[in-house]
Amino acid sequence: MNNSNNSKLTLIPVMITFFTMGFVDLVGAVSNNMQEDFGLSDSAANFFPSLVFFWFLIFSVPTGMLMNKIGRKKTVLISIIITTLAVFMPLFDSFMPTKESQLWLMYVSFSLLGIGNAVMQTSINPLVTMIVKGHLASTLTFGQFVKAIASFIAPLIAAWGATTTAPLLGLSWRILFLLFFLVGMIATLSLAFTHIEEEPGDEKASGFVDCLKMLGSPLILLSFIGIMCHVGIDVGTNAVAPKILLERLGEPGDSLSKFEYATSLYFAFRTLGCFTGSIIMRKLNIRTFFAIIVVMMGLSMIGFVFGTEQWELWAAIALVGYGNSNVFSIVLSQAMLSEPEKKNEVSGLMIMG
């Protein structure tokens, strides 16, 4: 009982860290504000999200190797510090002499945000395996639910800061960075002072090529492809769902903005899926649950292809949102459990996908 209670207490700073992982989604939340403040074109504003996620390709596998050298907890701490620094820097853009220098400060900030998030996503999942001895997929899914909370509130805070008349130290929408900086500090201190029993590091740490060779394992390769499909569905649904609704339900004169609620509907069911999935997977066999959510996504694709009524398209969005919310955690957990001696490297490969 004491070990169970200790594990639950240890998970608290880890879940706060999952919340900081959601900071990366503030890029989309503030891109419109930045476009207005800096007079950016659409293509320039859309470059910021690409800048953030570019670093996943570069840092994911090296982070897996770094964990073998310094340990998982230290690697996660480094990622939180980088992320916290990233959200701290924009608070000082008013001290920069020109708009151009302010913009470069944001470029550096978002680059650090991407680097920190790549390191964090790669290292925090193996860290959880040292705390939770059972129900790994369920715990990782709950962590994704906590992350989704940060993703959900980021645009709300930015919008409030941009429109409120309350005194915000002149920060306007940048108040989001201040609040997230404070949470980042809490995450850093809480994890730093939490004792986590680490597994011994791999004395023969894998190199980059050795990590890529792991794709020779059928399970690892299929998991890698599964993660890529998960990301593709996630990004694709966000981008295309409003356009599909406009095409099928729109009337002459309607604009895309009328159907942007499709993205919110998707995220609502994705968040619901993370929360309920973390509970269901403690009761139901993971393979059975995985089969159910795959069927849900299959039905969703049918709805997107053939649906013409509003309820059919809404159902398709809800099904893919709920189903896709649990794919990442299930696939990643099964991949890491299949190679218990190479969890760090497996995590790096999966995040690179």
Question: Which residue ranges define each predicted feature?
Answer:
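Helix-loop-helix hairpin linking two adjacent transmembrane segments in secondary transporters
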Residues: 134, 139-196
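Cytoplasmic helix-loop-helix junction between adjacent transmembrane helices
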Residues: 103, 109-145
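Intracellular juxtamembrane helix-capping segments at the cytosolic ends
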Residues: 119-133, 325-340
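Extracytoplasmic gate region of multi-pass secondary transporters
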Residues: 27-29, 216-264, 271
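C-terminal ends and interior cores of transmembrane alpha-helices
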Residues: 81-99, 296-308
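Central cavity-lining transmembrane alpha-helices of secondary-active solute carriers
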Residues: 47-65, 264-276
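C-terminal transmembrane helical hairpin of 12-TM major facilitator-type secondary transporters
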Residues: 284-331
